Amino acid sequence: DDLMVMLYGMERFDVDGDPGKLKRLADHLDVDGIDGIDDSDGDRRIASVQGLKEAYGFAASRFIVEQAEHFVADHDKELLICLLCPTATEQVLRGQPRYDQGFANYLRAAGHRVFDMNEVHRQDFGDFSLSVEDYRKRYWMGHYSPAGNHFFAHSLKDTVIDWLEPKPRTYRGDAPSSADFDGYLPTPV
C-alpha cells in the first residue's frame, strides 16, 4: 500500500502498479502527464513514474520541513537545512539542471537557513581540470570517503560559525585573551 514503494518498484523492477491509486496521488499533488503510467511505451511509463515519484518525494520533504518548523518554533530553536544529493551533485558537475531545484528554491523562498553542498561541489569542481568521474574519486567511494567527510565539514564550518551567537572564542576576532564563557553559561541569579 506504500505508494513510494510502488513507484520505486515500477521504476527499478518494472513491476505493475495500481494506476487508479497513482492517478489519485497525481491529482492530489497536481502533477500532469502521468497518463503514461499504464502505457505500453516503456520510456513514457518510466518518465511518468519518475515524475510522480519525485513530486511525491518533494511533497513529503516539504511536509517534513513544515513539521520541523513547528518543532523549532515550539522549542525556541533554529533550523539549518543541509542539501547534498548525489544525483543533484552529478547534475551540477555536468552543467545540467538540478532535479531538486524547485525544492531548493522553496527552502530559500521560505527563509530557511540552507547550506547547499551541491553548489559547494560545483564551485570546487570549477577549480580543477578533471573529468566528473575523476573529481568524484576525490571525495566518494560509493559514499563520502574520509576526504569527502572532511571537505563537507570544512565547507559547513563558516555557515555554522555565522549562525552561532555568541561566536566561539577563536572566531570572535578579539585579541587573544583568557578564555571566558560569556553567553555560554547561565548567569547566576
State what each model feature region is.
Residues 49, 129-139:
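Short glycine/proline- and charge-enriched loop/turn segments
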Residues 1-112, 117-128, 168-189:
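Serine-dependent acyl-ester chemistry module
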Residues 136-175:
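Histidine-centered active-site loop/cap adjacent to the catalytic His
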